[in-house]
């Protein structure tokens, strides 16, 4: 090692330890003391000063192993000295090692730094407190990497010995050397493989087997728990380490093992690892809190061979003093599986304390389950109980934590979780009636070798339905047509809160225990086709209990290791775009929701358990869709459901992506349940499925961003319009037992929007069945409206999936009644607003809050849309279907027409909700909504022009509240006003407006009024003249900012007024009144006023038999409330038509810059409404005349054809370009201008804003409440709008001025054409600023090689910025006006006029520097020549050498070294190293002393060698290179002279000047070349003069040695002189003392006498 230095080796600077050549370590690394800041700066400053003296021309790099993430102190200090400091961490998950990738970076950086040629780079190593162990490892790795040492253990021990042994013990409680040796072996093996470092090989860490257990706690045994750290295999970009797995510290998951009881212990892990992994085995004490490390290992997966890692006792990091606790035979075997391996299910047994509980299953039983999954037969009655589930039996004391797989087919089996500490059996069965299903297969499910399901997300592929017509790879998981399909039974349908409640009666485990123990881990994903979690319940307690009962060594990711549902598409979850695996009950919903639900009397049984028969009826009546098939939940045993890293699953936060929707299966499956309900009138409508299913789906969903409120959604017992932004929602509350009973035929239909009391149980009969074709056609329409397409504007809208359309938040029966048969599922665009919350997951989840749910669905899904009317004849309905399909796409795809009124589902959220029978629907009401496609703007096609601002991806639609779906907040108590929805982003693409669904008992929804900017969209077509109008379409996406909502459709006679839309944010339309409560319901509180200057919402309409809502709604014959005034800058929406026989409401005053709203069409018998007052209408946009009475046609159509069979299209909006409208209606953001009023830009608000603090909810009894109640807030004001516009107009430049100024600016500064890369062009222009002359003059100076005009730096810059061949070609091919080119292009063009301009510039540069170059070169040659002559001709030097030879022979007399005739030149330095016996003098001092006394004339011999010092700084090699450069340069001059002869007149001056220069230069070069030859010979002769070989002792070494001898000689002579003076002074002093002493002696006798 370099520590054993050679004799001449320089001593390193103080306080640095030299590890190898130019590699040093700060000595503070070997101490545990911590220096103060000032002391540390002084310490480093002293070292740096020494380094700079020691290595005057070197560069320094410091590698620092720092503590924590903050900037290191050494960086701050050394940056002042221009030293580079690279920081590395000092550990990896508490292990004093670094990831292999980081080690490789360190080694490569060090190697390249130290091996740079021509530079004496120095590497300094530093570590902060506690970093010595990793620094020692990295130094060892560097020595091995550079092959300076061999043998990993020897090298590591050698480096560790540089520090005190106690330091390593102090800094590392475990001996880190075994893992460090493992990584040193990785480094040593780097040449064996092709690539190093190898790629991170993904593996499945299966289990750990321990043989011959160690003793802990006084030889009691060992209670091992495991933790695994590593990088998240799913986070491709994030390389940081996380906790991948951890054992729960509970009695059921840990066990004390003793050597006498077991030979080996198998600890299951089952987690994915990749790259560097740290595995810790920890002994847990009896208190289950205290821990003691058993061992730790760090390894890299790329070096695992044959899927096993065998470790002896000496190959693990263990505590320093516990080796005696480990038997010599102790071994650990880490077993792996391939990343994609399917672990075969093997027979396993579970032992428990109770000997009677012994279960055994075989692979055959599991494959029986798989067979059942694969062979579900389509039953004509849509009822088949295929209950086959994998049951995991785990015993709490099973040492290996194994599981039992059990498959059985048992109808009406409920989740049974008997929990005593020994037996935990979960029989999870779901009774599922399946619709026609093609094939159900278990696809690529991974099972562990002991039969456990691989609970890691990567390893579990979806158990999906094998659709013949369904695409295998889905970007998103499709929504099932049937709400029962969305029920996603993962465990039994009854395995919801109800059974969990019953289970909780048997379980005694407390809820808080699992939560507090390992909160940071996430849930594991269980295998199952949309399997329900094993424990997601109505109450928290049963859920956690059920998890606790899952067996002993469970490594549960969250306190509740609940199965996660797998999307039902065939592809892996990786292929689904937004398969967010939902959080479980405990993490997703507060317990308060359960309480509030029970308070709302949703459940009557004590524990909220639904009786078996009720559930069975419920299931059989309702669950008959393809999706409600057997799901196979696999409840991992504790060991098989370990913690995953929090990053492995989306966190259960409100911003998680919604879960995927269930996918449709096939054409047979597309026959929605509504078709069954509609087509067969005799059977009662399928009641809603158990809340279990809905709950499971929603409770698992990671909550997306808080959605805005549903349209007129209400809490279960509250009439308030807007629910609060949801917290992580609770699981759905258990339904009342009577909710499962078959619903009786209905009484007269009440209004569908009424919020019923929870206990009301009457349900209306299903609508009359339409003809098959018409039903099929309507099914096409329904799915289309529910999806949004995120394709770019140029791409067509993909066919939407057939998800439930209006089943917003409703239970499965909503879809059953509302969904009609539909064709096989297309690739699934995200469902739009009609999918239940739990099934609505297809929209990509961008951060903006999702739009409100579709049609005023209550949070608890009580109020739903009216039932679908009987479909019209096939042709008409089919036509409307395609309109509907196109209407689903957002404006980012080609604009679909507004969809015709789709069929709204029955309002069957609960058994107690009313199901309204649909009225027969005439054809004209099916597609009354005009299609945007046929609203051309002056003949232009209706393809939507892209929005002015790029629309962000639409936010996910609101999850539709399904009981307490993930996004829905817990229902508040009666009358508690919910908080307003979050404001939508300001820009977005306009979604098409949805058509109002025609229904019998529900008024049409007034779409939200126009938002702050833009004109109102065309109003939706009027629904049929009888029956209540349909509910309002939902507002557009929250980020839609360019489309105004369609005006509210006219209400039908006999129907209650439509519920108004929710209040939009930021200048959006005013909120709608809440839906009227149902009979006996409490009156809802008044709706909150709109946000940001929006007008207050109209009062809610009254309900049948219900209490009057706070604001008096307009009744029949009464004048409806006036529409809210439009927001600033936006055109007002058309006012809603008056009620039958009622006076029309006055239209709102239009605001400046917006088109006036069309007047509302009068209803039958109603007076025509007054025309809107003239306001700030755009030019040429007169208000449309009111339509004639008697019918309710839409506003006048724009030019262009009308849709076949549809109502008249609405008037076009101002400035629209045929953009599509969102199916939900544009409720917020900037409105979409109507086509037809010219293509003027959309006008922004022309008024100054009033920055007030807005009240969003009118408190009951307040002034605003009274104004709302009496409708006064929406009456036309006395203020003159035109005067307001004049006084308070915003300063906006007129378009004419803008265009004029633009023209001026264009004329003043024309556009420059840029052909060259912008960065290069900028750099070129910067360079040209230093050449302050026109380009032609510059080129003339170059050709004349005029050194007075340009300097050498400018010429070098011109050479650097010469055009390349590619740039020349680019400019040559440019055919445009060259005067418009940029300055860089002009410069290049000027250079291109001269042939070979770069060569000419180099000639000029050579000429410029030639004189100086020759002068300096001659000076160097003369210095060398003079030095050689001086040394050889110096007689004094020769005499001194002769005396040294004599002196040496005298000393070496009689030895082999004696009798020398001469000595080598480097022996001169030995004179200073040879000391006298008294150590007071060296041989050099003696020589100088003798010469000074005997031959003082020789002492000034250095004066004869004056040129020696300057010559010693010259390298003959550099002289040779310079000579070669001069000769080559002259050759190039001649070549260019020859070539320029053919250039023509452009090079005449250049050629003449160059010829003259070459003649002079050749003479100079010949002289210098001759001198160079002489100098070379003299340098060689100098080595010969001292008897040296010039090849071994070159001129440079000779001069350096002589110069060093002169320095030492002078120094010794000076010291001799000083010593002589001291001795002389000392002698004088002694003489004086003697003299004084003698004087005293002579005086004494005189005194005596």
UniProtKB/Swiss-Prot annotation:
Residues 416-774, 787-1245 are annotated as: Disordered. The active site is at residue 127. Residues 1237-1635 form the FH2 domain. Residues 648-662, 680-691, 701-711, 722-732, 743-752, 795-804, 821-832, 843-854, 865-874, 893-904, 944-960, 968-1213 have a biased composition (Pro residues). Keywords: Hydrolase, Protein phosphatase. Residues 500-513, 585-597, 665-678, 809-820, 878-890 have a biased composition (Polar residues). Pfam families: FH2 (PF02181), PTEN_C2 (PF10409). Residues 421-483, 598-616 have a biased composition (Basic and acidic residues). GO terms for molecular function: phosphoprotein phosphatase activity. Residues 200-339 form the C2 tensin-type domain. This is Formin-like protein 20. The lineage of its organism: Eukaryota, Viridiplantae, Streptophyta, Embryophyta, Tracheophyta.
